[in-house]
Amino acid sequence: LVDIAEAIINKRIESNEKKDDDLLGILLQMRDQISNEHIRDEVLTLILSGHETTANVMSWAFSYLAKNPQVRKQLEDEADNATWIKEGRTPTYLELEESSKVASAILQETMRLAPPVWVAPRIATTDCTIDGVKIPKGAHVLVSQYVTHRNPRFFPEPEKWQPDRWLDSNFEKSLPRGAYFPFGGGSRKCLGEYFALAEARLILLMVAKNFRLSGKFPKAQPRATYRPKGEVKNKVSLR
């Protein structure tokens, strides 16, 4: 990944292309203020946090939809009724939010069962005791979204993919803090949460408006992210 990031940067530098309409172009204009290593790390962050995580969520979401035609039909109906799609224009954030209740529920349930970040490392900043377990200052603690999101105390039939649970406005309010945290929590919660959700909702609705996907449900291959094993092959047909 480091090699990929450095190749992207070097290619842009060698092209002598002056761009200020993307992040890399802006960073390269600041080379007298920040190091090449800093720029490389920013590119790595974009690759890991802004690309792979969202791509994994979309792969799982379309795979679940292929297995659940009733939910797919709900999404298609929502896409058909979206005014901004009918008018062929880009929605405002508020329009997107108001016209994507089903799409949002699909994403929330997908991230519950297949959270792109499935385990979150933290370091204890002070001695503490959690549920009777003593944790010394400096200890490395791993908190797993994958495990927590399957707690039957909070999610009835936890192994079933049921987006409808999120359409109940009281459901998410009833969850205690920390029961559902696909984007982490606290002061280090993912800064890209709202952008990622908007991007994913747009993709779901635009695909559902025009296409229908079907294919074999993939096996999981948890690595740095919770990803499908190998290629996710789907048959794509026009609606």
What spans do the regions from the language model cover?
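A structural signal for well-ordered alpha-helical segments within the folded catalytic domains
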Residues: 3, 56, 101-105, 178-181, ...
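Cytochrome P450 proximal C-terminal region
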Residues: 80-84, 189-239
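Cytochrome P450 I-helix active-site segment
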Residues: 17-26, 64-117, 131-139, 156-162, ...
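Conserved cytochrome P450 catalytic core segment spanning the I/J/K helices
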Residues: 1-58, 72, 88, 100
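Cytochrome P450 heme-thiolate "Cys pocket" and heme-binding signature region
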Residues: 49, 89-94, 119, 131, ...
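Hydrophobic, repeat-rich solenoid/adaptor surfaces of innate immune receptors and signaling proteins
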Residues: 8, 62, 145, 200, ...
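Cytochrome P450 catalytic-core helices
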Residues: 53-78, 193-210
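Conserved cytochrome P450 K-helix/beta-meander segment immediately N-terminal to the heme-binding cysteine loop
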Residues: 25, 143-172
